[in-house]
Amino acid sequence: MKVRNVDNNFVAAIGKSGIYPFRLNICLYFADGFLIDAGSAFILKKIKNFLSDKKVDCVGITHVHEDHTGAAAWIKEHYNVPVYLHEASIEEAAVKSSIPLYRFLTWKNRKGFAADPMPEFIETEKYRFDVINSPGHHPHHVVFHEKNKGWLFTGDLYIGRRQAVAFKDENISDSINTIERLLTLDFDTIFCGHSGIIKNGKEKFREKLEIFLHLRDRVNALQSEGLSFEEIDKRLFPDKNIWELISRGEWSTLNMVKTV
């Protein structure tokens, strides 16, 4: 994993997960004993190496998807520390994941683990991270805000300014509402679960919001003409994204159209 020093006792680690052509970036953030997200089981050995010289005090997981929880069971067993997760996802986390082949080739299945209910904030000696519910990519997604530093750890809420497809659990209207709330916060830097460290984060979120709102306007206009969601999808997205084909519709433009 590539490791980058961000601040005093705060490092970011980026690793590649999956086999070709499914390889994608995964980012972990370790700040003063607090680990944000637990990567995928595919890179478990790399995560173990990354943490080998670190004292982990607790883990905060942005959401229960397998690319953010892959090392959670090992961390819980090895360090015996709290692994915090949205309370509504604790039952799901306790059971080993069962995922389609394309996701297995990218992330692998994670073991079940005993998660701890997410507190309102997580405080270390140097930092305080406020926990903010942020539904959109997942209904039980959270972000972590270190307001004194202007940092926002966004899990899978941001990824990039323009979104090509939406996951089956995703709700774009929820993402819009969440982004509008987050834009009232004081932050400059986004720490994304896959795209890494992004400066001018508030402006990037504004751009993403505008793109979503423009899509909503287009969908509403076509609905007013009597088009169905499927017809609107074909009109707005005539060429299918490769991930839509590989995932057999788990990721789709249609879900963007339906939920915006």
Residue spans of the language-model regions?
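Short, flexible loop segments at the rims of nucleotide/cofactor-binding pockets, characterized by
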Residues: 12-19, 35-39, 59-62, 129-134, ...
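Active-site HxH/HxHxD metal-binding segment of metal-dependent hydrolases
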Residues: 45-124, 210
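Mobile, glycine- and charge-enriched loop segments
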Residues: 27, 107-128, 132-168, 251-260
